[in-house]
Structures are given as structure tokens and as C-alpha cells.
């Protein structure tokens, strides 16, 4: 059932993407709950994120653009999110902080306290080839103490991004 939700999300993400605009897709994998104090909830995660580099807003604190994505873990936990990211460039190096609220379903994984969770992430990537980036991300997901519990999770991710 949870895998069906992810497939539906990915289908809708690809179906409603404008055909003529540039779209950046990020495929990633990593470790869910890297600081697993109880030693029972660490899992491998696999995800997809979409960013439209044409939809952006330049401000005095950076270039902001919307992101949408989701991941699933090998313990059937699912997180689907949409939010905003900023991008800062230093030559080939890209630094991308982001914030995204999302829907979390624990599956057989860690109970984060409620369905509404917030992800804050920092990604460092290198633009090796034209429109192709390889990166490392560190993220934290929690519910801001709005739930009955708020254990939070920290994740480490390796990503591959390509603009199509």
C-alpha cells in the first residue's frame, strides 16, 4: 500500500511537469536516522526530488526556487514534501539549503510523532558536467514538538542531479 502511494506521487510529479521548461531531477540514496541512539531505526532511503530552475526569485539573500520530492526507506517509511530552496554558487561548488514541510508515514520504521513533519537540509554539490551535479546532503526531519513525541531523525544522502 505504501509503495503504491509513492508510485502515485512519482506519476503525478512527472505527469504535471511542463514539457517545454527545464526541469532538474535529483535521484538520491542514503541513511535514514544516522544517529540512531536506540539502534533499531536506521534504514536505507531512496528518493527523487524535482526542481524547476526556471521558476525562481532572486532576492538580496539568494536565489529561491520551489522543490518537491519524496523518499521511501527499506522499512517502508515514506516522506513526501514540498518546499523552498536557496542556491549559492562558488565556481563549480553549489551550496543549497532548503526547508520543506511534508507528510510522513512510519511504515515499519521510526515513529516521528505525527504525519506533519518538517525537513531542513543543506546540500553541497559539484557541477562536474554541464547541467549535472553530484552532491552530499545532511538533513533533519522533526515535527517542531507539535506531536505527542518528537524524536526527529538526521539523514545523510548522496545525490545525482540532472537538468533535462
What is each model feature region?
Residues 21-56:
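Outer-membrane beta-barrel initiation region
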Residues 44-48, 126, 151-164:
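Outer-membrane beta-barrel "beta-signal"
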Amino acid at each position: 500500500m505504501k509503495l503504491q502511494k509513492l508510485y502515485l506521487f512519482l506519476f503525478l510529479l512527472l505527469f504535471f511537469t511542463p514539457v517545454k521548461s527545464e526541469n532538474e531531477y535529483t535521484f538520491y540514496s542514503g541513511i535514514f536516522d544516522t544517529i540512531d541512539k536506540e539502534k533499531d531505526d536506521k534504514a536505507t532511503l531512496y528518493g527523487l526530488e524535482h526542481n524547476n530552475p526556471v521558476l525562481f526569485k532572486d532576492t538580496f539573500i539568494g536565489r529561491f526556487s520551489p522543490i518537491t520530492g519524496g523518499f521511501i526507506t527499506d522499512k517502508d517509511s515514506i516522506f513526501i514534501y514540498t518546499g523552498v530552496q536557496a542556491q549559492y554558487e562558488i565556481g563549480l561548488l553549489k551550496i543549497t539549503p532548503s526547508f520543506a514541510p511534508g507528510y510522513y508515514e512510519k511504515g515499519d520504521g521510526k515513529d516521528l510523532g505525527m504525519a506533519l513533519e518538517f525537513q531542513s537540509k543543506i546540500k553541497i554539490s559539484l557541477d562536474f558536467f554541464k547541467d549535472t551535479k553530484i552532491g552530499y546532503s545532511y538533513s533533519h526531519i522533526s515535527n517542531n514538538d507539535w506531536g505527542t513525541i518528537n524524536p526527529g531523525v538526521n539523514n545523510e544522502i548522496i545525490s545525482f542531479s540532472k537538468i533535462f
